[in-house]
Amino acid sequence: MNRSFHFLIKYIYIHVLLVFYFHIKQQAIMPFFIFFFSSFDGLSFDLRVVAFLAKHVFVGVCSPFFVVGFFGSSRVVVTEWLSKLVLPPPPVSITQVFSLSRKRGEFSSGYILIINPYKSFLRSLLDFSIFNNTAKNKSSTFTLNLEDVSK
């Protein structure tokens, strides 16, 4: 089996675990859909697709929703695209959950989870940052460790 197939199996496994975690531990944060995409190449295209789906497909259907993707060394491009599309400039942290605030009904509350494939996939699952965009457009970041939450 080639390397990309192993990546695929790992990330499908992670996504299933995340769905169960949010379903059991955080019932107020129910994932509606997981969009699995690879962005090793064609990163700009992938993020355009994510933005289109978030704006035209998921909004108004179920809130919150999840869009899941991963990237490697191009985090600067990811930051630029996300800040232009739906968010203020995010923190530098690679593995993040972005919380979208309501803006005149244009976006429902939602989350974009970006997993770093170059970390251990278990570490990516257990330790990630949450980006919180408040109503006053002030940003705060904190780290959520799922090991601590599950105790």
UniProtKB/Swiss-Prot annotation:
GO cellular component: a single term: membrane
Biological process annotations from GO: cell wall organization
Main location, first listed in the record: membrane
Domain of life: Eukaryota
Membrane topology: Multi-pass membrane protein
Annotated localization: Membrane
Keywords: Cell wall biogenesis/degradation, Glycoprotein, Membrane, Transmembrane, Transmembrane helix
Sugar-bearing residue positions: N2, N132, N137
TM spans (from-to): 17-37, 51-71
Function of the molecule: May be involved in cell wall organization and biogenesis.
Name of the protein in its database record: Protein ECM12
Native species: Saccharomyces cerevisiae (strain ATCC 204508 / S288c) (Baker's yeast)
